[in-house]
């Protein structure tokens, strides 16, 4: 969209601010009085009419004032977003002093999700960091009685170990299996279909153990932490059961779907109404930002609320929390 004339920018910004604060349509006289616009009500009324023609404002009823449309919110977010308020500045200060003092990652994520929800009155979502199946760089096989200890070195510089039972009379195969596996890893990944037949008795259970190890870590990483649903339900837009039921089902059954998959590899952003691909969110807005960990994991921080959202606060808060997670988990 082409840039708006200055007067229309002022009127759109004031209309959005009024509607976010009051949930009430607004007329030209109220805008002039409340926001001190340097124009007469007639001039502001003309600007509102022009904005309505452009699809940025809409009139719910003939006798009512005007409210922003989804297109109007988009214009506001892209071009007219004000500086975040004092509450976000305070949050940024708190986060700057935050250190990794939690015994478990989930404790940290819960703390930050709750802080976001309390600050904004919206529902917050933080996904646990996901990463691709780690690529093994090398491994070592060590016999201990009737057990096999497997020490794994990954591409992320992390290490881990497995412990499995050895088949009888397999000691002679261990050195050959270790050599074959590390030769495979030096090229790319293990091609188990090429495992020599005389190594199958030890190689097959090791293959199963490695697969189970990776599945377990992926399950541990899955999931999204959500909080603030009660605050979201207090919003006037979600008072009707018919509009609320699809959203509640999504939160309960598929919280990951609340996030826009288009942001998975992007810088994050804002999705308003039907810009989001999931129909249950067609009446909502989602503000989202990514974070990354030192091991290559990626997660998202998001807020979900009505389109009538304090976007400056929401976007700044989400970006601050995502940045803090990237810093703490680096």
From Swiss-Prot:
Cross-referenced Pfam families: HrcA
GO biological process, one term: negative regulation of DNA-templated transcription
Source organism superkingdom: Bacteria
The keyword Nucleus belongs to this UniProt entry's keyword annotation: no
Keyword field: Repressor, Stress response, Transcription, Transcription regulation
InterPro entries noted in UniProt: GAF-like_dom_sf (IPR029016), HrcA (IPR002571), HrcA_C (IPR021153), WH-like_DNA-bd_sf (IPR036388), WH_DNA-bd_sf (IPR036390), WHTH_transcript_rep_HrcA_IDD (IPR023120)
One Gene Ontology molecular-function label: DNA binding
Assigned protein family: Belongs to the HrcA family.
HAMAP family given in the database record: HrcA
Function comment: Negative regulator of class I heat shock genes (grpE-dnaK-dnaJ and groELS operons). Prevents heat-shock induction of these operons.
Protein name per its UniProtKB record: Heat-inducible transcription repressor HrcA
Organism this protein belongs to: Synechococcus sp. (strain RCC307)
Gene: hrcA
């Amino acid at each position: 969209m082409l840039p708006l004339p200055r007067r229309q920018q002022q009127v759109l910004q004031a209309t959005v601010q009024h509607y976010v604060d009051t949930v009430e349509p607004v007329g030209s006289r109220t805008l002039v009085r409340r926001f001190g616009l340097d124009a007469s009500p007639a001039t502001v009324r003309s600007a509102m009419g022009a904005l309505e023609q452009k699809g940025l404002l809409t009139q719910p009823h003939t006798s009512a004032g005007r409210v922003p449309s989804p297109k109007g919110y988009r214009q506001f977010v892209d071009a007219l977003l004000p500086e975040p308020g004092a509450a976000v500045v305070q949050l940024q200060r708190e986060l700057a002093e935050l250190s990794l003092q939690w015994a478990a990652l989930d404790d940290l994520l819960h703390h930050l999700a709750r802080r976001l929800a309390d600050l904004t009155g919206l529902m917050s979502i933080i996904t646990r960091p996901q990463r691709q199946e780690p690529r093994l760089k090398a491994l070592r096989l060590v016999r201990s009685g009737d057990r096999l200890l497997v020490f794994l070195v990954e591409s992320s510089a992390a290490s881990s170990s497995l412990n499995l039972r050895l088949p009888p009379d397999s000691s002679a195969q261990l050195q050959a299996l270790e050599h074959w596996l590390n030769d495979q890893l030096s090229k790319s990944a293990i091609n188990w279909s090429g495992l020599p037949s005389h190594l199958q008795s030890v190689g097959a259970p090791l293959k199963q153990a490695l697969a189970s190890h990776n599945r377990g870590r992926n399950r541990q990483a899955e999931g999204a932490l959500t909080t603030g649903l009660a605050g979201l339900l207090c919003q006037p837009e979600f008072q009707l059961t018919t509009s609320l039921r699809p959203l509640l089902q999504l939160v309960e059954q598929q919280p990951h779907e609340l996030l826009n998959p288009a942001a998975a590899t992007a810088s994050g952003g804002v999705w308003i109404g039907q810009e989001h691909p999931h129909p249950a969110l067609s009446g909502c807005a989602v503000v989202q930002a990514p974070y990354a960990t030192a091991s290559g994991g990626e997660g998202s921080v998001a807020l979900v609320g009505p389109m009538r959202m304090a976007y400056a606060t929401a976007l700044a808060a989400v970006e601050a929390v995502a940045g803090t997670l990237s810093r703490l988990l680096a």
